[in-house]
Each structure stands twice: as structure tokens, then as C-alpha cells.
Amino acid sequence: MNIQHIDTRHGTANQANFSNGNCQPYTGVPFGMNYFAPQTTDQKGSWWFHPDDHTFQGYRLTHQPSPWMGDFSYFVFTPINGLLPENTLFHAQSSYRPEESTFCPTHLTINQLRDGIRSTLIPSMYGGVLTIDYYKNESGLLFRFLVNIN
């Protein structure tokens, strides 16, 4: 089996009142300290990703074992172009096409339509490498610390 053919979105079409597996589209290395996933909403608690959403809020560094258990010590970082009216996820989020993105255990690739950004995140044992291709002249990165320490 070729690991590049695995789509990590399987089992992720969940809500608090209906489960299709309660999985998240994690990208990481086996026994890694952290995992990464795209965040598509910050309005649904522990269900912060849905495969049918077309909004990309950023890459989430997560420790969430299950939506029912919640996340801890997480944060979201978003590639941006130019200045934002406010430093919020709402102002930094962008639309994206899930069908043109790569959701793989070894890497995530997202094309942000509003900002003209293509980014690829490759995980490592303790972190990861984020490659960002900007198609405009004003590059940046918004770190949004949404830390919830229980």
C-alpha cells in the first residue's frame, strides 16, 4: 500500500449530534509529540474540521484524541498576505477547495483562494516544516494562540 494514496478525511464528516467515526484528518509521524490538521471552523467546539466546509482558518497543532474529549495546548497558525483589519481568525480565514487540497498522513497542502497562497505542511517528530508560496508581494504568518489548558 502506498501511504500517499491515503485520504485522512475518511470518517471526519461529524457533528456533535451525529457521528461518522469522529475522526480528525491528522497529519503526523507515528508516536509524534504533535499532530496537525486544517481548521475549518472555530464555532463548533471540538468539531473544528468538516470535509464539506470551504473555509480554511489555518493549520491547527493539536493533541485532541477525540472530539468528545476535547483539545488541550493547541494553537492555530495561518499564512496571510498583507495586513489584516484585525488580528482574528475571521479576518485571516480564506476559502479553499477541498477537492484541490491534499490530506495525507505525510503532508497537508492547501491553496488559499482569497490570499493566493499555496502552503504545504510536513510533520516531524516534534514539529514540522511549513512551505509557503505567496503569489502576491506581501507575505506574513498569523499565529493565533487559542490555548485551552484543562
What are these regions (language model features)?
Residues 1-150:
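Accessory carbohydrate-recognition regions in carbohydrate-active enzymes
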